Amino acid sequence: MKSFILTLFCFISVWTSVQAQQENTQLDKPLKLKRRDAKGVEDLKFKPEEITHINFSRRRLTEFPIELLKCTNIEELTLSFNEIQSIPEGIYSLKKLKRLLISNNKISSIPEGLGSLTELEILDISSNPVNTVPDFSALQKLHVLNISSLQLTTIPKSILGLESLNDLNISNLQLTSFPDLSQLKNLHSLGIDGSRLTELPAGIEKLILLRTFTASNNALTSIPKAVLALPALRNLTLSKNAITALPIDIKNAETLFSLDISGNKLTTVPKELFSLARLQNLNLSENQIRVLPNDIPENSVLKELDLSYNALTLLPQTLWKCKSLTNLSLESNLLTTLPNGISALQDLNTFNIGKNPFESIPIKEIMTMSSLRDIGIVSRKEIERRREEGKLQKAKETSVKPELKNGK
């Protein structure tokens, strides 16, 4: 009975390998028993050798629970979003550790012992004031590494040699120069946001397995042809850069499924962008686009198109040829009217044309579109009218208050 009570009220998940096989439980779905008024660290004293999964995230911990070092069979340890300042060198004793998540703490240094955890598959030490990391060359099973938002000024060579890596996030570092990434040939996902780049790092063209690439919040002025030619690329995010034009070679991005190029300096877009065979999500918001191509092709497979916060004054009627569209945003442009034929978009669910100076809207045609669930049609003129009405109403209320106080 005593063992049952202790197990019921513990913070952590206690699984034996036999239980895990019986329940067919995956590593990324640990059982979580939450009781905020319990002392989670105390639970570590209960058969620590049987513990394989621990989640102490968001527990306001200021120190690494030293009792954890007794959990020699632990496979997953999560200590994210606390106020831990250091990791003990003794962490090397957790030889079976496969997943270590210690992001968003106050850790200033990573012990050398962490580099000897050869079973590690996933490591997240992001968002800590760390300025150096140990030699990771022994972590040959590591396939996910997040070292974003650290104080690193260089990326260690030991990381650049980890051919097992599939997912690497090196965003928001303090790099003075960017290394060649060509050795990381097995990368599927790469994040280099907020790196003050004016051009992409060398070796990108060698990452032939890369599927997701994000390089937002940089100073890029163009998209290199080599990136568009990556044979496996599906998701490309280049938002908040200084890109002024899209190359005609965009037509070579035949595998692209999602493209986010919002927050740049585009004034036009090539028609080839709309004919990409697999492109379904396109975000062109917050640019300076004045016109769209007149000859948008009928074979477009776009489902989501965001053109909000641009400078469009007219839309081509051929836009309605994008018959796969389910979400379309034209909010905050300079549109005064819409071309006829919008009812051809029979799959459209969300349509936002608010904050435009419309003089006329084909409202009857829009209302025949049975698939529409969300329509935003408030114009700039309407907003200004309501604002003026609000000011007038406020003035009236102010003028009658003295009378109300006097009981008149």
What function would you assign to each model-found segment?
Residues 132, 143-199, 203-222, 234-245:
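Solenoidal tandem-repeat scaffolds enriched in leucines and small polar residues
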Residues 48-49, 69-73, 92-97, 115-120, ...:
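Leucine-rich repeat
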Residues 31-33, 52-56, 77-79, 97-102, ...:
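Conserved hydrophobic beta-strand positions in leucine-rich repeat
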Residues 29-34, 44-85:
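LRR N-terminal entry segment and analogous cap-like coil->beta motifs
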Residues 1-25:
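Bacterial Sec-dependent N-terminal signal peptides
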Residues 42, 64-67, 87-90, 110-113, ...:
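The feature encodes a structural signal of leucine-rich repeats
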Residues 339-408:
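Leucine-rich solenoid repeat scaffolds
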